Amino acid sequence: MEVLIPKRIQLSLILALTVTFCAGQVLADEIRIAVASNFAEAIKEIAERFEAKTGHEVILAYGSTGKHYAQIKNGAPFEAFFAADVERPKLLEDEGRALSGSRFTYAVGKLVLWSPKPDVVDANGSVLNTGDFRFIAIANPKLAPYGKAAKEILQARGVWDQLQKRIVRGENINQAFQFAHSGNAELGFVAFSKVKRPNRAVPGSFWQPPQSLYSAIDQQAVLLKSNATARAFMAFVQGEEACTIIQSYGYGTL
């Protein structure tokens, strides 16, 4: 009789075998991971846990999903790619630049309209329609899935066209956050993970748009090279410990 092993147990076994094998190695391995900017804080904590357990080093490169995709197509030496969408990992898989069957959803992103000042953004995001601000920051919709989602929300609220001269576009969602945080824009659409931090309140005011206003931000990862350490890291990301970390930064998990 065939015995089916739950996926999380399979992933734990992969990690355990890798740790056991690596204990006998003189030198630890080093892997390079391309990561969507919105996921920077969460994956840094996950990588630190993985390094402590395995002795391997995880080098993280942050940027917009579109920019990383272009770099990978041009031969950038990454072992894995954590995107902010489904499209780019799937394209890499279809193009033969990623390992078939390695793609999975590691997080579901959420977008918020945030201002570092209290009382600027109310529970309904009314400031979008009243226009009581000079500039609003978003990520570039052509490069960043969070920027595309921000555009969809502004279109749904009927203000996209009229706000064109007041929109400050960041290359990625972290840059959009910096524009708002520094005061170069009074408010901005940012990843919920920038507002919801484990054990720390982020000052300001925010509105969390209903999911019906923008396309789901399913964030997928994919292996680019058949590397044992990279496989172990991907398995670790899908385990319970990493999922708890991901959720603590305001993401959903499947």
List each language-model region with its residue ranges.
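Bacterial N-terminal signal peptides that target proteins for export
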Residues: E2-L13
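Bacterial N-terminal signal peptides
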Residues: L11-C22
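Exported/periplasmic ABC-transporter solute-binding proteins
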Residues: L27-G55, I59-Y62, G66-A76, A83-V86, ...
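Active-site phosphate-binding/coordination module
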Residues: G101
